[in-house]
Every structure is written in C-alpha cells, then in structure tokens.
C-alpha cells in the first residue's frame, strides 16, 4: 500500500512546512534529519484534523455509496447514474481508502505514541475510540484490510491484509475496551478541550459513546446479549449523540456540499419512498423526499453529522431485547427520536404511531417492523447498509443484474502499488464480508 500526500484539515491554525507534500512513508523514517519529514504537530492540533477526516468521510462518500446500495438514495445523472446501476470501478474507491489511511490511521499512530509517552490518558482514550470507530467503518465496506502492518512506510510498503473476523474486529473491541480504562484514569498533564470537536473533552460523554459503538459492534457479529447490554450503557437521549455540527458558511456538511456542486446527480430512492408511503409517513417524506440541492430542508450546510446516535441505540434495544415491554418502549423511542431528527414534533409523531400498521402494541412488534423503522430513521446513515446486509430487511430488488452490492471494491491503487493486495475480482462487489448474513 503506497500512501501519498498527507493533508491536514485542522480547525486550528497550523504552520506546515514544505513537507506537506511529502509521502507519509517518510513519516515513519528513522532519519530525523530528513528535510522532507513532516513538522511535529502537537496532539491538540492533530486530533481535530483526524476527527474531522472521519466525520467528513462518513457523511461523504461512505454515505453516498452505502446508502445508494441500500436504496435510500439513487444516482440519476452523470457518473452517479452508472454507479446506481452497479457500474463502478475500483478507482472510485481510491479517495475514501486514502483518506482513512493517510489522514486517520497513520496520524493516529503518532498521536497514540505521543499520548502514551506523555501520560496523556484522555487523549489516548479519545484516539483509541476514534480509531475503533474508523476501523469498523472501513472494514465494514472493504472486509479484510491492512492493519497490523499498515503505516510502516519504508519498512514495509506492501502491508499484508488482515482478516476482518480474526484480527480487525477483535482489534476494534480491544481498542474500545482500552479507551474505557483510560477514561476512568486521571487525564494526565494535557487535558482535551475544544480541540476535541466531538465532545469538547468530556470523558463521561466519551464513555457513553464507547458503549454505544460496542453495541453496534456486538450487533454486527450476532452477539445480541452483549449488544443489548452495551446499548443500555450508551446514550440516554439525543443530546448524547456522537457527532459534529458543521458551522456552514464554506465549512459545510458533506451532503450539502455534494448537492450544491453535484445538483441533480442523486435523488430520493423509490424503494424508500414506497415503504414510507405505505406507512402513511407523509410528514417525514415532506422533510426527506425533496429535490437534492442546496435548499434541501434536512441536508443543510449546518447539518449535524452523527457517527452514532440515540435513535440507533433504541432500535438496537428493540431488536435484541426479549422483554416485550422493553422492546416496545425502545421501538417507540427510536421512532420519536427519528421524527425529532428531521425537525418534527410530538403531534406528528403521535399521529404516526397511532396507526396499528406502525405500532401494533406490546408483544406484537415484529423484527421486520423494527428494521423498517430503523431503515427510515437512519436515512443517509451508512449503518442502514450494514443492517440490510445483516437482516435482509427491507427486501431490495437489484437495480441491475441479479444481486445488490454487499461491499465495496478494493481501490485501484492497492492493486497497482501493494503486492500483498488480493487478486482482482470483478465480482467482489457482490461478495459478503465476514459478519454478513
């Protein structure tokens, strides 16, 4: 894997020398006198850059493709019409792969080392939690990927691919567990604050987030008991959500930026429209099934981009609980939070759930109903693609051919520059990752 230009996107002013354009392979060189080595960026400057790279990626191309394959949105013009018909090539995935490795994983190696050396426990906890989230987001669409040998630069420019099931996923759990331990210790000399763009250094909020990510983790691997237990330790309300609110005015949310520049390329999908219409979900349709341009009422320039949310956790509880009353309460909580997410209030929510087709009452809710409401509630959230792969809900009809994509291609650059990359496979888009049912 040949990593290229490291780009820093910090909310702080960072003075970067000409080394901005050097290869990240040099980042790990033993030659401290290397004139092309990057400047020594402090943790407080590196952290927001890393976090924003994850948030931008998740709300950008990860959502564009994953939610298109999940049939929440559809490509209707230019190259996106071809992508919608599953005519997509490995080169299209160079950017998201590069973004995660160069701007997140490689940078985190240095941040973790500095935090460890300095005894900055809470910075280290945030770094590990962020890495775990980014790893899961990446492996869930790519499957096996370089991890244990990634970021070694000149030492190994052809890192081996680690197994998702036996290496990557266990590493995710370990990182999350370690982060909880660190958050329960004293901060150390440096205390995270406004440089943590997600929680402003609030370690109690981070603990809730880690438990919430663990709930998703266990759900993916089919461990419902632990998914339920972790979900109950996670977010208690929407105010706990793990995410970032874009300020707008040029620093815009990813979907707004896409729609502003690529107006007419993507639209609301008929599959989701049909499901919502069948449930008389007119109020939410009025917020979502709108022309995808800069005036979209939900996909605004100042949209909050949640990495994981209270509504997702409530649907996890509804799916995994065996207690009928608990399942029903969580189901309704998830729907209500989904209404609030798009700016709707109690009156609209009450009218909607008054329908027996939506809420059949305690003891009568089916898994299909839970997953359909989660599918609606996680609009443009990549997790909707994971849910479909886990459960097969909703039933999706292929746009082209005989199958719906279940993952992404490996990027073209991996085939060109990493001798350890898997052999090319034209059918890879339709093959399952390890946890896919």
PLM regions with names:
Residues 24, 203, 285, 300, ...:
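Long, intrinsically disordered, low-complexity segments
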Residues 45, 222-317, 322-373, 377-378, ...:
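Hydrophobic-face positions in mid-chain alpha helices that act as interaction patches
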Residues 24-25, 173-186, 203, 207-259, ...:
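Aromatic-residue-lined binding/catalytic grooves and analogous aromatic/hydrophobic interfacial grooves
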Residues 24-73, 87, 231, 396-437:
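Membrane-proximal, proline-rich intrinsically disordered regions
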Residues 48, 75, 79-146, 152-187, ...:
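Conserved, well-structured interaction surfaces
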């Amino acid at each position: 894997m040949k990593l290229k230009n490291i780009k820093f996107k910090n909310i702080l002013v960072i003075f970067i020398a000409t080394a901005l354009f050097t290869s990240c392979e040099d980042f790990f060189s033993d030659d401290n006198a290397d004139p092309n080595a990057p400047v020594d960026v402090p943790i407080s400057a590196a952290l927001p850059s890393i976090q924003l790279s994850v948030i931008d990626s998740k709300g950008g191309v990860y959502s564009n493709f994953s939610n298109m394959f999940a049939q929440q949105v559809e490509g209707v013009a230019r190259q996106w019409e071809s992508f919608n018909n599953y005519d997509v090539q490995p080169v299209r995935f160079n950017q998201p792969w590069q973004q995660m490795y160069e701007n997140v994983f490689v940078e985190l190696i240095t941040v973790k080392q500095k935090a460890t050396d300095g005894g900055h426990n809470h910075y280290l906890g945030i770094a590990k939690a962020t890495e775990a989230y980014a790893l899961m987001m990446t492996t869930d669409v790519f499957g096996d990927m370089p991890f244990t040998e990634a970021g070694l630069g000149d030492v190994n420019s052809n890192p081996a691919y680690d197994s998702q099931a036996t290496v990557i996923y266990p590493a995710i759990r370990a990182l999350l567990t370690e982060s909880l331990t660190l958050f329960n210790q004293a901060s150390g000399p440096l205390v995270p604050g406004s440089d943590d763009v997600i929680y402003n250094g609030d370690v109690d909020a981070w603990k809730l987030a880690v438990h919430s990510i663990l709930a998703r983790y266990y759900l993916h691997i089919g461990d419902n008991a632990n998914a339920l237990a972790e979900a109950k330790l996670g977010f208690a309300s929407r105010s706990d959500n793990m995410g970032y609110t874009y300020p707008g005015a040029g620093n815009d949310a990813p979907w707004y930026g896409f729609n502003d520049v690529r107006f007419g390329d993507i639209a609301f999908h008929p599959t989701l429209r049909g499901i919502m219409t069948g449930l008389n979900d007119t109020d939410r349709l009025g917020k979502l099934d709108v022309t995808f341009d800069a005036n979209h009422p939900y996909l605004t320039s100042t949209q909050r981009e949640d990495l994981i949310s209270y509504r997702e956790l409530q649907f996890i509880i509804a799916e995994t609980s065996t207690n009928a009353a608990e399942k029903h309460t969580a189901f309704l909580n998830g729907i209500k939070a989904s209404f609030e997410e798009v700016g709707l209030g109690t009156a609209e929510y009450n009218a909607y759930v008054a329908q027996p087709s939506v809420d059949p009452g305690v003891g009568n809710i089916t898994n299909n109903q839970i997953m359909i409401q989660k599918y609606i509630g996680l609009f443009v959230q990549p997790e909707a693609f994971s849910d479909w792969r886990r459960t097969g809900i909703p039933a999706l009809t292929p746009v082209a051919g005989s199958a719906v994509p279940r993952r992404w291609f490996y990027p073209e650059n991996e085939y060109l520059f990493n001798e350890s990359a898997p052999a090319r496979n034209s059918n890879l888009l339709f093959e399952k990752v390890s946890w896919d049912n």
